Amino acid sequence: MTSLVSAQRLGIVAVDEAIPLELRSRSTEEEVDAVILAVYRQVLGNDHLMSQERLTSAESLLRGREISVRDFVRAVALSEVYRQKFFHSNPQNRFIELNYKHLLGRAPYDQSEIAFHTDLYHQGGYEAEINSYIDSVEYTENFGDWVVPYFRGFATQRNQKTVGFSRSFQVYRGYATSDRSQGNGSRSRLTRELARNTASPVYAGSTAESLRGTSAGSRNQMYRLQVIQGAAPGRGTRVRRGKAEYLVSYDNLSAKLQQINRQGDTVTMISLA
């Protein structure tokens, strides 16, 4: 847990002091309601949810303990509501960042995690991508079947990388904001840092100056690749042609272009980052 003074300065008191919610066999109706709302808040990135968008059937099953909290999280993440809010409206890298935040409660640690999930979606589609987080060992160890996922990027936990703390500020911009109302629109927040394997600047609030690490220093020239992903051979039309963005160093540019070509994807733009 971060010290109170530091948490106040960084604007993370609400997250730092939050108590995880767990659905128990003897939970009251009010406690069940709190769990359901907490799942919507976490998985949907604190975005406004209209009454007609609620998953009433899944809610009913959870109230009757016919499904677990993990199952309810899965239902929300696989729903058309989640797809419309985060899948259809974001590039692939941003979508993966949000999946890490919503389902595992942290920011991605390195480029290999982004690459893994990009390839997983390309090969297995939307459901495989979502299920990979919820069925992971990391999810089980932190939330199990009955705890509502929560943002834990500012905590110190086993198997957690230190760089995750600073990168968390890029995907978390305050308790009162939503993941669809932040600045920079749908652009990925971590593409540059992950590509360079450097730490993000830490901002003390929305308009304060940042405490910069190596990401603010000079580096070798990076190139930004914008890519349209083609469906894997033999797949149905239900898998969309997604967009992705990569930051690649000059030394790795040729190899990355060859990899993109082998995957059947199309590079639409190469520019200096």
From Swiss-Prot:
Its main location: membrane. Belongs to the phycobilisome linker protein family. Residues 220-273 form the CpcD-like domain. Part of 2 PBS rod complexes, the conventional CpcG-PBS rod and a photosystem I-specific CpcL-PBS rod, both of which include ferredoxin--NADP reductase (petH). CpcG-PBS has on average 3 stacked phycocyanin hexamers (PC, CpcA and CpcB). Linker CpcG connects the PC stack to the thylakoid, the hexamers are linked by 1 copy of CpcC1, 1 copy of CpcC2 and the stack is terminated by a single copy of CpcD. The CpcL-PBS has on average 5 stacked phycocyanin hexamers (PC, CpcA and CpcB). The lineage of its organism: Bacteria, Bacillati, Cyanobacteriota, Cyanophyceae, Synechococcales. It is found in: Cellular thylakoid membrane. Gene3D superfamilies: Phycobilisome linker domain. Coiled coil: none annotated. GO terms for cellular component: phycobilisome; plasma membrane-derived thylakoid membrane. This is Phycobilisome 32.1 kDa linker polypeptide, phycocyanin-associated, rod 2. One of its GO terms (biological process) is photosynthesis. Keywords: Antenna complex, Membrane, Photosynthesis, Phycobilisome, Thylakoid. Residues 1-180 form the PBS-linker domain. The N-terminal PBS-linker domain (residues 19-157 in this experiment) interacts with the C-phycocyanin beta subunit (cpcB).
